[in-house]
Amino acid sequence: MKPVRRGQTDTALDISSHAKTNGDFIKKMNTTDSKRLKLLEDLKGKLEVECKIRDGAETLLQVFDTNFKKETKERKEMLKKKCTDELESSKKKIEELVSSIESFQGENGEAKTGSTSLTRSASATVSRKSSLQEKYSTRFSYKAGCSDSCSVTVSGTGELIGPTRNAHSNLTPTVIQRIDFENVNEKNNSSSEDTQPNGKRPSSLQSNFSQFPLNPWLDNIYKACLEGSMKDVIDSSNNLCEYLHEHSDPAYAKNFSLITPTILSMLELNVSEVTASVYRLLRHLFLDATAFSCCQMLNLPWILSKSLLSGTDAYQIEREQAFRLIRTLYFLSSTEGHEDYLSGITRTIISICEHVSDVSRGIAVETLIELMIIRPKILFKANGLRVLMISLIDGSISENLAASAALALVYLLDDPESACYVNLPYDIGILLSPFTSSSSRDTFNSSEEQSEQAAKAMKSSAKVASVLLNSWSGLLALSTNDFQALRSIVDTLRVPSFAPRSDVIDLFFLIFQVEYSSWSESFLAGKRLTVVKNQAVSNDDNINMVNIPDGSNKKYMSLRQHFTAVLLFIFLELGLVESIVCMIRASDDPSASRKATYLLGEVLRLSDELLPIHLGAKIQSLPSLFNMASQFTAEDRFVATSVLQSIESLNRVKFHSATQPFSQTTSLLFKEQKTDGSFRGQRQVEHVKLKMGMQIDDSHFRSMLAETNVLATKNYQKWRWDTLVQIMEGPLLSPKRIDETLRTTKFMRRLLAFYKPFSNRFSSIQNTKPNQKFIKVGCLVFRTLLANPEGVKYLSESKVIKQIAESLSQIDGYSEQVSEPIFSNSRLQKTLTHGYFPMLKVLSSQKEGHAIMERWRIFTTLYHLTELRNRDDLIIIFLTNLDYRLEGHTRIIFSKALNTGQQAVRLTATKHLAALINSESANDNLNHWAISLLIFQLYDPCLEVCKTAVKVLNEVCARNENLLAQVVQLQPSLAHLGEIGSPLLLRFLATTVGFHYLSEINFIEHELDNWYHHRNIDYVDLLEQNFFLSFVSNLKIIDKKNNEPDENILPLHFYGELVKSPQGCEVLESSGHFESFMGTLVEFYDKPLGNEAIRQLKSALWAIGNIGKTDQGITFLINHDTIPLIVKYAENSLIPTVRGTAYFVLGLISRTSKGVEILESLHWYSLMSLMGTSQGICIPRHAGQVLSTPRRNVEFVNERVPTPEFSSLLSSLTNSEREVIRLVSNLSNHVLTNESARQLTKIRSKNAKVFSSKRLVKACMTILGKFHYRVQIQQFVFELFPYSVLLSSSTSQDLNESPSRPNNLSISA
């Protein structure tokens, strides 16, 4: 049931009649003459009421559909009918009243008044009622957690009373609530009076106010304030907020003088919920910088500060809305005067951040974080940056909020103009203090609660440090003053008595993004390491692919690996390895020693993978450990040998488990094949074992058959399945053995009987990981039988194939349906029934198997299954488990499903084509067929399928040049896909055939102009966005999504693909674009740049880098002597992200042999593989060449010097007021606080009038805005002054003191 407003019916449209008919008034005409004039006034008043009802009804009908769109159709018709009836009734009554007035005036000889002016007259303002001074007992409630459109609601009976976006939100007040007859007379009597601060509007505003669009709402609010109806005040304010939310108009901001009296009347009530409504209303009204004029009229900073300092739960709504309004003011501030105006509020928020137990501390921290991004100068002037940093690492806020603040700090440091507000390295060193200060853990040893707080502080600091160290801005900031901050972290590992050393190790795990696995957790727990070979399970939805950005078969390191390389190199130069060894030698904690050993092993692995041999050789040799281990008389020899053995065991286990921490990408398409020497050797060993198994003698063979227990029992749980695998992979591959087994034993018959679907043995086994061995053995049985003609004959006559066919026909829609089919959805999920499809894959891999499937009409059944619309799960299973190397029914079935299946089927089948192309058994025929289907999928009606097909073809072309040539020969049309097909077309540029094809369709000319003017900058934005999203996801700041772009994949660049062909190089040279990029680099070097100039510079760097990463494009860089200039950018640029971009670009250039040579001459070393090919990573000889930055001194802003205005204000104060100022100033002194507070309390008790001085309150508020005070002190100062004084300077006369909040002048020391 919807809430009902006070004085309304449940529909808010059933308006009661206040006027009587014309006949009623004719009867009154016979009264005495003394009553005639009063009756005439009554008629005019009622006519005015009816005019307002008519106007309101007309307005409501115009916006009816908008305001009542959430109502049901029947209710809307009923409400609309009532509104129409009321409109007609009002018009009829107006006619009667006008006729009566004209007749009555005619009888008295009065001049007639035109009906138009009578019907359109507006009521004047009303005087304040005495009820304003009464205390209100209404109970308030608030809907917490609301958005920008949330409402403050009030109820006197405990019910939640609207409006919060309900059907009555925007009703015109005159239609919602009738005006009483007595109020009309009172308003008419007071219309000529000026409204003073005691509740009257100035007469000079009457004409403008009557035409103001917000007049109905403001008038209703104003009247409710005078009547003291808190519910009506809040309801009307909510209605106005709803209107402003949907009809915001900057013109309203120019009429603040019309709005201010209503706002003041609300503030004078001094009720928390009404004040919250004021803040919400102002937030909707403030649209630009003109809002600060209204702030000055209302003394808004003082009121807001008082609201923020109201620490009890009763003021929660008010504080929340105050913070929202303050954020709006921060966003709208645009001048230095605005920043100074907000300094007092900012210092109040800073003091709240310092107060750990304050309930609003979290939102105060968030506000300062937002302020650091949009207006850092305000925060700097209030000395709030250091307070904010301390609050991030004290453990009182969440890790994610601390990480978000670190991201904001990174944003601040990236801009040279805003970075000057950070005092490096001291301000940023605060964030690392929990790891470098010995008191960080010792101070919390007194209680369990404080120890938990210390642990939270460590986690928050680690999160913040990892964010900073994984960004260029943060890394450069921490490298200031010869890596002072980073060096202190590394050196803490050398201090034996330093308690948080284990936390420092955890910090390095987070910095290098070391992933834990089951075996690593076992090692850290002190358990013995066991080697478990990883059995790769093919999964099309989670297949890895290395970064192949240039379209060749070469594998290059990603941008993330490039960044990790320089980060690792810095810590190695700072002595990380030696510090870890010192910690291991001196640690008495076995757990900490194991953790340090594991970190040492990961550091060695990363240095081997990411650092050039020139830089990593010394680290890999571990001189200190080997020296300790080789000295037999040393006490630490056992420790050294134990560490070396542990590292060797870790590397061995890691190798056999085949973990690849850097190769996990979001590619859904490819799996890196194992082609290393160990895998080839393993295959050779297996081949030898297979040959030896086929040559065993008869007795050994019979013994193996007996060991399986198949001949002894039908209970499959007693069978030796490992022995069965050995027999299938060895002896039974011999024609002699299989023939003998089939003729003389029941071995194969009993084995196949186990797999019959209708026997409910294999088909009823639960689908668990250990039970997957039954599927593997079943596939081996089918493969073994197909390897021999006798086995093929036996299998074709076996009932197992027949029953599989019959089971499939149970659901094909053409046969008789059964209640519980074998291949039901539930059985596929819960049992091993899905294992029959891998067995069918074995059959479909050979011609003999095709013949068996044709005999039992399995292909016909599969054709029928593709037509099902409610079994996508089944279709997907058999499509992904058939073999398509042979031409025939399998390919036709796949093509049919690809064309006519549901969207999920088509999408999965498109992805499966990529797995087929990448499979080990793929041949040219299969690849050509798969590519032709992928081309066809480019025209699928589903956009997601098209995107997947483009992605598959793009990665296919990047992986194999022969497949790229096949795709180009088919000449697919991608015009209908727009930007989605651009990456695939860019691949075509790498070949001569593709270049000519793109030239014919004018693609090159169009893209050349598009990239030069627009796409170059878009490329920068895309790359940085992908890098950032992956960065915050890896640090678990946000949840990782499946469709999240991967920073490992470098997006294709038009110029990089263009120069891969000779014809493309000619086009680039004739266009003159490279010279333009070079001009940008030369022009912007060592100059202050704006945001657009920075983006343009980055786009030029990436364009040059992508050109220089190819053997043909590097010539352009050599001819223009580009590489030394890029090195200067990497070493000297004042903009961190530009320096990082130049560093990445040098990595691209190092992919060519000529680039490696030039970089080496400039003292930059490139990472080379064992085969002598570059890996796309280059590192300077010394880390200081790129990262070390000089100490930055921040200019101190002294705002404590009195301004002339403040000095003049002080000179006008009386002696008593000056004494108050002196005592308030002393409150900031911890020594004088208590005595000053007592003196101020004494003055207030003896001479309270002194605190009603507007001069004094202005002086005190100015002092609070210039100096730092604790929360308790600020609360105390605000409680000294009556609430009315804070509003007084916005009017021309003193205000009578309104009912103020209870004053509590006692403060704690």
From Swiss-Prot:
Residues 105-128, 183-205 are annotated as: Disordered. GO terms for cellular component: cell cortex; cell division site; cytoplasm; cytosol; membrane; nucleus; TORC2 complex. Residues 24-110 form the REM-1 domain. This is Target of rapamycin complex 2 subunit ste20. Keywords: Cell cycle, Coiled coil, Meiosis, Membrane, Phosphoprotein, Transmembrane, Transmembrane helix. The modification Phosphothreonine is found at residue 1203. GO terms for biological process: meiotic cell cycle; TORC2 signaling. The modification Phosphoserine is found at residue 151. Component of TORC2, which regulates multiple cellular processes to control cell growth in response to environmental signals. TORC2 is required for cell survival under various stress conditions. TORC2 positively controls G1 cell-cycle arrest, sexual development and amino acid uptake. Positively regulates amino acid uptake through the control of expression of amino acid permeases. Either Ser-203 or Ser-204 are phosphorylated as well. InterPro entries: ARM-like, ARM-type_fold, HR1_rho-bd, HR1_rpt_sf, Pianissimo_fam, Pianissimo_N, Rictor_IV, RICTOR_M. Belongs to the RICTOR family. Residues 113-128, 194-205 have a biased composition (Polar residues). It comes from Schizosaccharomyces pombe (strain 972 / ATCC 24843) (Fission yeast). The keyword Zinc does not apply. It comes from the Eukaryota. The lineage of its organism: Eukaryota, Fungi, Dikarya, Ascomycota, Taphrinomycotina. Its main location: membrane. SMART domains: Hr1, RasGEF_N_2, RICTOR_M, RICTOR_N, RICTOR_V.
